[in-house]
């Protein structure tokens, strides 16, 4: 992969456009930085280059739940990812130019947080051309992530008051260490554009 060129504004350029350059070890160095960066890149159709992913964590690099968030964003936008494998500490993500909608299924394959995956996908899906339904499999109740109940009873009512019609149904509970829980998130896009 060729390194991005310096742009006139000091930002990095790649293939003629701006690139979000993120050091994944910043602040707490958690996977949340990766998930929200991927969501923002997807929303803005702006390439993302992230280095030192989770460098300050015990297990550095992408874990299955982070990889699934990247793959899901790429799937929503028709994008491409380089470095998309468990353990990778550097990725280039090139989102597509339009946001897909419809029925999607993603399985984290571990007890990784389905709610954190949903948090990643809701912002782009709210600006798609039609309604979406996500069926997410993994963990629903962990110590280190908001639970499905928190999302259902705290976050989503706040989003609805803001005009975002997002609903969550718990299809099957899932706990560490196995996960295997399943939730479904349905939403309609917002009126207007970003």
Give the role of each language-model region.
Residues 2-194:
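Structural preference for solvent-exposed beta-strand-turn elements
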């Amino acid at each position: 992969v060729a390194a991005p060129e310096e742009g006139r504004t000091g930002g990095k350029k790649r293939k003629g456009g701006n690139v979000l350059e993120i050091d994944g070890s910043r602040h707490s160095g958690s996977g949340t930085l990766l998930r929200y960066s991927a969501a923002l890149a997807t929303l803005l159709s702006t390439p993302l280059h992230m280095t030192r992913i989770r460098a300050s964590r015990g297990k550095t690099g992408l874990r299955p739940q982070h990889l699934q968030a990247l793959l899901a964003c790429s799937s929503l936008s028709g994008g491409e990812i380089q470095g998309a494998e468990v353990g990778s500490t550097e990725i280039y993500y090139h989102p597509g130019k339009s946001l897909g909608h419809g029925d999607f299924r993603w399985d984290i394959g571990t007890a990784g947080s389905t709610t954190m995956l949903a948090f990643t996908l809701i912002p782009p899906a709210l600006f798609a051309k039609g309604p979406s339904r996500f069926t997410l499999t993994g963990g629903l109740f962990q110590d280190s992530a908001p639970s499905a109940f928190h999302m259902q009873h705290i976050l989503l009512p706040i989003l609805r008051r803001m005009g975002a019609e997002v609903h969550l149904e718990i299809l099957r509970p899932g706990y560490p260490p196995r996960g295997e829980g399943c939730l479904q998130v349905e939403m309609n896009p917002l009126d207007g554009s970003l």
